[in-house]
Amino acid sequence: MIHRVTFQQDKIAYDAEEGQWLYDVCEAAGASVPFACKAGACGTCATQVVQGVESLGPQRAREIRTLESNGLDPTQYRLLCLADVHGTLTLGASAKPQHATAPLGMCTVRVKEYRPLTLTVCEQRFAVESGKITFSPGQYMIFHVPGIDNVIRRSYSISSHPSDRTHFEICVRAVSGGFCSNFIHRLRPGDCIKVEGPYGDFRLADGSQRDILMIATGTGIAPIKSMLLSLLGQTGTRRIRLFFGLRNVSDLFYTDMLSDLRETHPWFEPTIILSQPDPIGWPGLRGRVTDLIDEQVSTDEASNTDAYLCGGRPMIEEAKQLLIHKGMNVDRIRHENFF
């Protein structure tokens, strides 16, 4: 069965097959809908449904959460990466415009260095086999992991400095039962994998001279690290604070790097807090990373600060509310959810 899909923004009509993935429809039709994670995590492909919402089937809870976290009404918008065609459909404007910077596109990268950080977290350094990579701190790459029956796409934030045009690094936690995370975690020097990108709107504010507060939990430190390295390499001494939350001592990583950066950049203030530390062996702060907002951020400071948050959705939402309550303008809070 064939269904007509109309893209009002591009003035394109395309005949899609029953059950065809809307990402494939957009690609085949040449529609200008932007895509990034292709897994319902980022909200990049959110598009207004003008007519035929019933043709997309029911929404998943994850899709609703992603739309709402991007300030979009789930009754008016759908994530096209999570939708299949089951009837006549008319689509309106995309919620997010296409990026002006052309991505590297699809390419093969080779593992240059594998660096274990904890028992479950590693840093992988990749060499771009052909071409050069240009990315903004905070962006991510999509990895094409070969599965049993098909290729699985997973997004990983770049953790390295953007000045290196031939290499990039990511931070990976091997999750129990996670096929993709374990596959990438097991890669070793010389191994190759296909990637595409870079993508993402989680970027540093252009031209801002306000102080900076960065909040990260777990491997959410990856894009924050890229931002931090970029900022500390610039001229200027505006105050930069990092609140880094982990569970226990065995989860600690990047501590030496953060300590070294503090020694060489006195205006950088990293703070590490553990939520579930062992009874002994941790002399530092204990609690949740959001506790630090209440304890260490004043209302005067919040009014002159840009915030960058990366971690699980509950932490992001709580931190946003706390910062807004402190007087921070919501437009100065940028975030990336990790799943």
List each language-model region with its residue ranges.
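Residue-level marker of beta-strand positions
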Residues: 21, 28, 44, 88-90, ...
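Short, charged beta-turn/beta-strand-edge "cap" motif at the junction between a beta-strand
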Residues: 85, 97, 147-150, 197-202
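Short, conserved phosphate/pyrophosphate- and ester-handling motifs at nucleotide-, phospho-/glycolipid
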Residues: 138, 220, 312
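Histidine-anchored nucleotide/phosphate-binding helix
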Residues: 225-233
